[in-house]
Amino acid sequence: AGASVCHVDASKGMTAWAKENAALCGISDIRFIVDDCIKFVSREIRRGRKYDGIIMDPPSYGRGPGGEVWKLENELYSLLTLCLDVMSEKPLFFLLNSYTTGLSASCMEYMLGVTVARRFGGKVTASEIGLPVERSGYILPCGASARWER
C-alpha cells in the first residue's frame, strides 16, 4: 500500500534465499542489497534517504573482509544509534530480533528505549522467543525480540 521495501544482508546466500522466498510469495518489488549493513546505513544517511520502519535481525557474530570481529552485544548500541539518522521524522516502527544468548529481551527493550524511544517517543515492548517442548510443556528459550512503535 505505497510502501517500498529494502532488504540488506552481507551474505549472498541469505539474500538469495530471501529473494526465493519473496518470489514464492508473489512479491517482486523488494530491493535486495548484498552489503554490510553499517556501510549501507551510512551511505543512506549521506544520500538523505529516510525510512519509516526498520526490521533488524543482526547476526550474533561475524568477521569482516579484513578479519575484523563483529559481536552483536558489543555493537548493537552503536548500530541502533546510527539507524536513528536514517529514520524519517515520524517513523512508525522498529523491530529488533536476536538469537544472541547474551542479549536478553529486557536488554533489547532498554536499548530501543534509550535510542529510538528517546528520540521519537512512543513505546517499547519486548519478549522472549521460544520453542514449545511437547513432552514437558515448557518453552525452550532461543532468542528475544523488541519492538518500538509510535
Model regions and ranges:
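Alpha-helical scaffolding segments of alpha/beta enzyme cores, especially the outer helices
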Residues: E20, K39, S78-D85
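Mobile active-site "lid"/loop adjacent to the S-adenosyl-L-methionine
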Residues: K12-M14, V34, Y51-L82
